[in-house]
Amino acid sequence: MYKILLLLFISLFFVSCGLKNNAFRYFEKDEIETKGVQYTKKTDILKDNEVDVIFWATYLNKVDKKISDTNEELFLVSVYFANKESQDIFENKYSFLLNEIEPVSVEKVEKDNQNFKSLMLKNNWGKYYLVKFTSQDVYTLTIQLKDQDSNTAQLNFEK
């Protein structure tokens, strides 16, 4: 009995001294992709208890140091409209706001864009947008996806 416990204790000791479990150690991910996952959030807009819009946003200023030195707040945003034929935010009359301020620009990003390929979360159905806002001197950034009928999805990011 003591021999079994001793072997179990020694085995446990060697196993616990090994590498700690990390979700990304089984995948080949570069630093940008890993940070992209860390600074990406998702929310939904529900209508009649069913998902109508899926909204993802990645705060790019936290992902890449080069971006954080600019005077802009940059987000890579993905939007999927569940029950709509068109996936375009403008055709569906949606807009973005950051702390109630409109963006400087909204650019459509193609899925094969090499600059953002490692940040795109394999969303084959929705569309991606690069949304630029003027820099804000606040601690919390709240990006909103809003339509004309006051349906809103919002995500909060720390600056």
Can you say where each PLM-predicted feature lies in the sequence?
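Bacterial signal peptide processing site
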Residues: G18-N21
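Short, low-complexity, disordered segments immediately C-terminal to signal peptides
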Residues: A23-E31
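Sec-dependent signal peptide recognition
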Residues: Y2-L8
